[in-house]
Swiss-Prot record:
Domain of life: Bacteria
One annotated GO molecular function: rRNA (cytosine-N4-)-methyltransferase activity
Reaction(s) catalysed by this chain's protein: cytidine(1402) in 16S rRNA + S-adenosyl-L-methionine = N(4)-methylcytidine(1402) in 16S rRNA + S-adenosyl-L-homocysteine + H(+)
Name under which the protein is recorded: Ribosomal RNA small subunit methyltransferase H
PANTHER family xrefs: 12S RRNA N4-METHYLCYTIDINE METHYLTRANSFERASE, S-ADENOSYL-METHYLTRANSFERASE MRAW
Lineage: Bacteria, Pseudomonadati, Pseudomonadota, Gammaproteobacteria, Pseudomonadales
E.C. number: 2.1.1.199
GO cellular component terms, A-Z: cytoplasm
Positions bound to S-adenosyl-L-methionine: G35, G36, H37, D55, F81, D103, Q110
Function: Specifically methylates the N4 position of cytidine in position 1402 (C1402) of 16S rRNA.
Length: 313
């Protein structure tokens, strides 16, 4: 079924270039998806190069296994990039990786396939899990969460200003029958939204918040960034593409913190080893955005932000 839905890789050339790939280098693609970045990176690697891909999505893993069968330099692992530290240590690669790429968010095939339950535009089962075999679905959360919990998810993760109003409408309606379909939930949210933003579906922010919560996306990102830093060799590159302000803020603060030194906010007279004050990352250039040409070809790239850093120690 995944072959039906096309995915256009965002910031493809820019991301691969930012990794500054060496022919014999070892690289991690923490968000394999449909393999756009991985295939482009493999083209830059020589016979001694290695690429390890991660993804939670079973359909992405199928694509990854096909690529691994074609190219012996590539290996795919069905794990969240939050767990890349465990995988890297198990393979004896900690501190030896030359570059890590994280392309965050949900892919076009996931959004466009109604059966995955991510979209408010196409009716399908209310699921939203990147890996349908793990965790609770969006329908289960909506069925069991309190009104306050639902409102918090919409407000904190979706940045939805009418979160309380929407949560109240959901709890009232679920007393009659459970929410099982995306269109059903989207309709109730839409009615509860009194001020639609021009050009934006009124369910957009609530669905984003629900998806982020169901998949623990921000928690995974924080763990993944820490693990990526430890996996990198000195001189290795960390390249992260984010798609909304919550993700980008985490990435920006992480890179800034390690570019200043981990003890930057501590009093200088504390008995702390001076090395703690030394930066671990160097920020490379300014944040990059999709070009006008890419925006025309792929409107979903409009919110993409890419940040790049190099490991110093």
């Amino acid at each position: 079924m995944n072959a039906t839905y096309r995915h256009i890789t965002v910031l493809l050339e820019e991301a691969v270039s930012a990794l500054a790939p060496r022919e014999d280098g070892c690289y991690l693609d923490g968000t394999f998806g449909r393999g756009g970045h991985s295939r482009a990176l493999l083209e830059k690697l020589g016979t001694g190069g290695r690429l390890l891909g991660f993804d939670k999505d079973p359909q992405a893993i199928q694509t990854g296994k096909a690529l691994a069968a074609e190219d012996g330099r590539f290996v795919i692992v069905q794990r969240s990039f939050a767990e890349l530290g465990d995988e890297v240590r198990a393979r004896g690669l900690e501190g030896r990786v030359d570059g890590v790429l994280l392309d965050l968010g949900v892919s076009s095939p996931q959004l466009d396939d109604p059966e995955r339950g991510f979209s408010f535009l196409n009716d399908g089962p209310l699921d939203m899990r990147m890996n349908p075999g793990q965790g609770i679905s969006a329908a289960e959360f909506i069925a069991n969460a309190t009104e306050e919990e639902i409102a918090r998810v919409f407000k904190v993760y979706g940045e939805e200003r009418f979160a309380k109003r929407m949560a109240r409408a959901i709890v009232q309606r679920r007393q009659e029958r459970p929410f099982e379909r995306t269109a059903d939930l989207a309709e109730v949210i839409t009615v509860a939204n009194p001020a639609w933003e021009k050009g934006k579906n009124p369910a957009t922010r609530a669905f984003q918040g629900l998806r982020i919560h169901v998949n623990n996306e921000l928690g995974d990102l924080e763990r993944g960034l820490d693990a990526a830093l430890e996996s990198l060799a000195v001189g290795g590159r960390l390249v992260v593409i984010s798609f909304h302000s919550l993700e980008d803020r985490i990435v920006k603060l992480f890179m800034r913190k390690h570019a200043k030194g981990e003890a930057d906010n501590l009093p200088r007279d504390l008995p702390i080893r001076s090395k703690v004050f030394e930066p671990r990352l160097k920020l490379l250039g300014k944040p990059q955005y999709a070009s006008e040409e890419e925006l025309k070809a792929n409107p979903r790239s409009r919110s993409a932000v890419m940040r790049v850093a190099e490991k110093l120690r």
